[in-house]
Amino acid sequence: MTAGSTSPRPSARSASGRPKRGALLPTVIAVVVLIALFVGFTQVYTNILWFEQLGYLRVFITRNLAVIGLFVAAALIVAALMFLSLWLAHRHRPRGGEVTDTMRKYQQALDPVRKVVMVAVPLIFGLFAASTVATQWQTVMLFFNQEPFGQTDPQFSMDLGFYVFTLPFLRLLIGFLVTALLLAGVAGLLMHYVYGGIRIHERGITTTRAARVHLGSIVAAFLALQAVNFWLDRYSTLISSSGKWTGAMYTDVNAVIPTKGILAVAALLVAVLFVVAGFIGRWKLPLIGAAMLVVVAVVAGGLYPWAIQRFQVTPTEQALEKEFIQRNITMTRQAYGLDDTQVTPYDATTETEKGALRQDTETTSNIRLLDPNVVSSAFAQLQQFRPYYQFPEMLNVDRYDIDGQSQDTVIATRELNPDQIQGWYNQSVVYTHGYGVVAAYGSRVQSDGKPQFMQAGIPSKGEISDDYEPRIYFGEKSPNYSIVGGAAEDAPLELDRPQTNEGDAEDAKTTFTGNGGPNVGNWFNKLAYSIKFQSTDMLLSDAVRPESQILYDRNPRERVEKVAPYLTVDGKPYPAIVDNKVVWIVDAYTTAASYPYSSPSVLQDATKDTQTAQGTTAALPNERVNYIRNSVKATVNAYDGSVELYAWDDQDPVLKSWQNVFPSTVKPYSEMSADLMAHVRYPEDMFKVQRELLNRYHVTDANSFYANDDVWSVPNDPTQQNRNVSQPPYYLSMRMPGEKEANFSLTSSFIPQQNESGNTRNVMYGYLSANADAGTGKDGVKSENYGKLRLLELPRSSVVPGPGQAQNLFNSDTDVSQELNLLRQGASEVINGNLLTLPAGGGMLYVQPVYVQSSGDAAYPTLRRVLVGFGEKVGFAPTLDGALDEVFGGNSGAKTDTGAGVSEKAAEAAQGGKGKDSTPSPSPSGTPVPRSSSLQEALDTANKAMQDSDKAMKDGDWTKYGEAQDRLKRAIDDAMAQDGATK
């Protein structure tokens, strides 16, 4: 460089640009990490606010501390064992000696990062192992808080709590420790290999004393754990379902259980040999012991039990297995609450006679003609009033005392329809709640077939109550979230109810005054919930005031599941007006999967029926259980969302154990009001699980059970085109044979087990009812008869039609078909309602409402006919009374509810399509209603014309179609004229 020259100056861009580029990436990463952490924090923070507002913060804290504690403990145990194994292997590595080039390269690569690897690798594996253990927090909490069952198993005389609480925990613990030891062993083995503690060469494998002691101790610990596993296998035979029957059978008791004990002792002995070998350096004896252990496990644990089963049990299986089958029957019935089922032989007749129903007036007067799965659209058209309201697809059945008499009721809440509301402000601030309960008599309709409401309108009025809180802020169809409260008294923001003819000149508005959700008035809570719901509108809107609350997680099932995560919640909550407020009543279950000798059920499969298939009832989880109790009744206030849990089965050990985990969260049922008690009912999902078990476990004699020749099945729903789904149970008020009075009951029927060909007889074999009426009129006192199961067993020679056969009788009846075809004219649709089965008249009575729905968007079904079946006889009339009389010789002797059917005028209007046809209802059985030959000829002509019309339309021959329609019109006119002449 020449004198006077200056060194080149770096450009400003490069000088300033490189540091900026170098700092940009870490800055971006740091910002992203901070944002992610804050988003995660808001999820936890908003959960804390939600649980705290609801009064169940302890549940949130206890559950999360349990999960976090298990995760940390499991991760640390695995990491500590792996680190200790690595550290010991490195610390006791051989010094000096020959090292192969390959090993030297491994050591040179590992040494610079060895300390990091020895910490990081165990932590990574620990995190993976801990994630599995943490999901089992319920198993751990139940073990440490268990309550005894007070009953012992028939084999080991252990309290049943050992199998339900202790055994699952021990299995979890042993499985975790085995995993941790295997990871530690592999880690130590690799470290010994890399640093020369284990050398592989042509002469074989050589190990240092330190490596032998280290790895031998790990193998010994592994074998000791296997010994514990073998010992626990003895108890696990009582919950095994690997054979024909659940539980320890003859081979298990006499072969498997003894050999498992022998294997446990053998494994311990081999473990001791490995410890000794580690110190003395002689592996021959422990290796022989390990090989012998494998041989014994195969022979004694597999071949010997197989030989006992094949050559001793199979030839005389019934005699040898009888004792153990009886255990299975007894324990299964106990586990599912079937042990107190009252079985009554019922020699049902199929013969009819006049006055046969005179003794069943309490049953016939309560027969429900409104199908809650059909009339939802009728509720919507008659009571929805505005498009932003809706009713559920399936309504609910309850009962109310009206004028001192219990009335079965079809009931629903008028909830918001968020799909019809546009814009954030409207969705979140204005349209915040539904309004009112709508209820109709179950056993009567108006003269034109419409539901006869007992509670309806806006404002809500009726025979149930004129003075209750009608606002539905929490329901099955509520919006995702709403901002409520905080508005000035003179400037409310929430739409309360639409303009009506009751004096409201304009839409009424209101302000929520309850305590229903966390406060979002301060800026931090507002920011947290804006992030949670990804809404900038919430953050910027001036509609969010200092006193505003946010309502979310509003579905009753979801709220109960969150505050009681240990419960399985029934798929169908239902609303009731209780103590002048609307509450959702939610049934919840405690379950277990390791009740000894009890056969397992998969909840989702056992509860599957038409309603779950259609999505009108939530499906239960795909969980395998063998013990269930309806231990909790929960209520969710429809106005403020408050959740109350009541210990319905306060003797359930599983519930009592959970009460130890979450104290003061479940109240005794003695705190339930008389009004609430009156609306508690027997839960559907529990009943469906029980009836599924009764398909086999109605048999209580071991010999008969072994023969397996009396297996039942729940009939498929005959009203559905897809006949491969079970008929749902039905709520009915009726008097069972031998009882003094009618009770609100949940019912189902049984037919013989159906084979794949479908050729099995569809006849009635059994009829199950559960007393679903808990009310006594007193606070905190439930009826002694509530939950009582009664099973009517029909003779196996029964010719009483099952539901499928009864539906076929209805469908194949010529006169019924003719009238149904007439009802279908004018593009009307005929809808068969639920097929109800009732024990009455000394036999089984079938009743099915028939609805007609015209075409068009505003159409809804109305009752038009009632089908009745008894034996082979069918009645079909506008009224229930008329249909019963047709079956029972012209006078059934029954008393039916006022309005149990439609008027003759309405029936004529429906049948003729133009309001003129007055064809009397046919009487295919019993005492027939006389028809003139001219009238019958006209009906036959009409029927033929309809068939010709259908054929012409399918063929696309519109000329013949028009001719057939002309003949049909003339035939209908002739029929009306002839029928008028006979009156």
UniProtKB/Swiss-Prot annotation:
InterPro entries the UniProt entry points to: UPF0182
Gene Ontology CC: extracellular region; plasma membrane
Membrane topology: Multi-pass membrane protein
Chain positions covered by the region annotation Disordered: 893-959
Subcellular location: Cell membrane
Transmembrane regions: 22-42, 67-87, 116-136, 172-192, 213-233, 261-281, 288-308
UniProt entry tagged with the keyword Membrane: yes
Superkingdom classification of source: Bacteria
Protein family membership: Belongs to the UPF0182 family.
Name of the protein in question: UPF0182 protein KRH_08700
Organism: Kocuria rhizophila (strain ATCC 9341 / DSM 348 / NBRC 103217 / DC2201)
